[in-house]
């Protein structure tokens, strides 16, 4: 039971850190390369 409580307390922290890092990475990519989803399709 102690292991289950440890798991339930660690998983939200790890997922929060992961999603925060992913959001920051996506924000920085969009800052450095704005409209990256549009340019490759209309550059030909």
Curated annotation (Swiss-Prot):
Tell me yes or no: is Chloroplast among this UniProt entry's keywords: yes
Q: Which domain of life is it from?
A: Eukaryota
Protein localization = Plastid, Chloroplast thylakoid membrane
Gene Ontology BP annotations: photosynthesis
Alphabetical list of InterPro entries matching this protein: PSI_PsaJ, PSI_PsaJ_sf
> Member of which family?
Belongs to the PsaJ family.
Q: What is this protein called?
A: Photosystem I reaction center subunit IX
What species is this protein from?
Lotus japonicus (Lotus corniculatus var. japonicus)
Name the gene: psaJ
């Amino acid at each position: 039971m102690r292991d289950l409580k440890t798991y339930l307390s660690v998983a939200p922290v790890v997922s929060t850190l992961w999603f925060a890092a992913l959001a920051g990475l996506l924000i920085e990519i969009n800052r450095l390369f704005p409209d990256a989803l549009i340019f490759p399709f209309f550059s030909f």
